[in-house]
Amino acid sequence: MDPLQEANGTFALNLLKILGEDSSKNVFLSPMSISSALAMVFMGAKGTTASQMAQALALDKCSGNGGGDVHQGFQSLLTEVNKTGTQYLLRTANRLFGDKTCDLLASFKDSCLKFYEAELEELDFQGATEESRQHINTWVAKKTEDKIKEVLSPGTVNSDTSLVLVNAIYFKGNWEKQFNKEHTREMPFKVSKNEEKPVQMMFKKSTFKMTYIGEIFTKILLLPYVSSELNMIIMLPDEHVELSTVEKEVTYEKFIEWTRLDKMDEEEVEVFLPKFKLEENYNMNDALYKLGMTDAFGGRADFSGMSSKQGLFLSKVVHKAFVEVNEEGTEAAAATAGMMTVRCMRFTPRFCADHPFLFFIHHVKTNGILFCGRFSSP
């Protein structure tokens, strides 16, 4: 297995577990865009700061810790994922904003552009705090086709802010096999043993790849997007099994093993999947701190590969991701749906996502987890 791919996959599942500690909350993030944004900052880190970042990003498995091969790996990964001519739309806004007193090194700026196609921008956080915040928000909105606004809420930056890493991503893809809007109807979603909430449930009967993992009592369904460059992978535990059991068990190695296409049966399935829209905003500082990246956010930070200025540290790492799942695919215009009853033939297997599940948007060629999330409640 490619070491960078393994590092990114490990980091993805670690983050999913940390951000999902409150099991009642929905979770949605793009681990690949977070790791690429942080890897860019990692280029400027030295000493303990660098080794902690390598550990948090699971890059300690990659040779030449901090060496060029990691950044070259990200360069080819990002080129592949963001390439033009795909049947899906992916818009990433990745930028490091530094206070104009930071004096960022030209060599660091060049590397960011070369490997991450990211420009750095120097703002006046000290003198024009609010203007700087609004400037960042406007830039992100423009980069994500106005889907992601207000990435920085009021008060998130102040006159002491020195470095802000902003990462926002917006994805739009159509299902290879679309759901018929006329089959969408209201059904109860079992939030917990004692609570139900109504949800607009989509329905599709067709052939899909599906498997059952006995050790965790979980069905796994694969829903391909048009041209099959990306798949949505849904992990749905049996009704008597808590989703947290699955979350505890899943590692990147198991994820790859469980979702191997040659291990899945292609069969006719009745799929019930809720329509949902999630927009999640994370201040990543706490999660990264829990993964061992402690020095980067305070006075002990060493970013001498980025600037010769002493005392430079990362003030904020913010991540915002948006997903909408509907009949056409992911993110499309809303439509009203007629009511219809679905007659169920007994012998067709069912995949009925009417209780909490995990979902992943998986990039087939690179085996990368572009997005991952948990749908706990409508």
Swiss-Prot record:
**Record keyword Cell cycle present:** no
Under the heading InterPro entries, the entry gives: Serpin_CS (IPR023795), Serpin_dom (IPR023796), Serpin_fam (IPR000215), Serpin_sf (IPR036186), Serpin_sf_1 (IPR042178), Serpin_sf_2 (IPR042185)
| Subcellular localization(s) per the UniProt record | Cytoplasm
PROSITE patterns on file:
SERPIN (PS00284)
Q: Which first-to-last residue range defines the signal peptide?
A: none
Tissues where the protein occurs: Expressed in the inner ear hair cells, keratinocytes of hair follicles and epidermis in abdominal skin.
Transmembrane segments in this chain: where?
A: none
Q: What is its main location?
A: cytoplasm
N-acetylmethionine is found on M1
- Gene Ontology MF term list: serine-type endopeptidase inhibitor activity
Q: Which residues carry this modification: N6-acetyllysine?
A: K197
SMART domains assigned to the protein according to its UniProt record, in alphabetical order: SERPIN
Question: Which Gene3D superfamilies does this one have?
Answer: Alpha-1-antitrypsin, domain 1, Antithrombin, subunit I, domain 2
User: Which Gene Ontology CC terms are recorded?
Assistant: collagen-containing extracellular matrix; cytoplasm; extracellular space
Residues with the Phosphoserine modification: S153
Question: Its family?
Answer: Belongs to the serpin family. Ov-serpin subfamily.
Q: State its role.
A: Inhibitor of cathepsin G, kallikrein-8 and thrombin. May play an important role in the inner ear in the protection against leakage of lysosomal content during stress. May be involved in the regulation of serine proteinases present in the brain or extravasated from the blood.
Name listed for the protein in its UniProt record: Serpin B6
Organism expressing this protein natively: Mus musculus (Mouse)
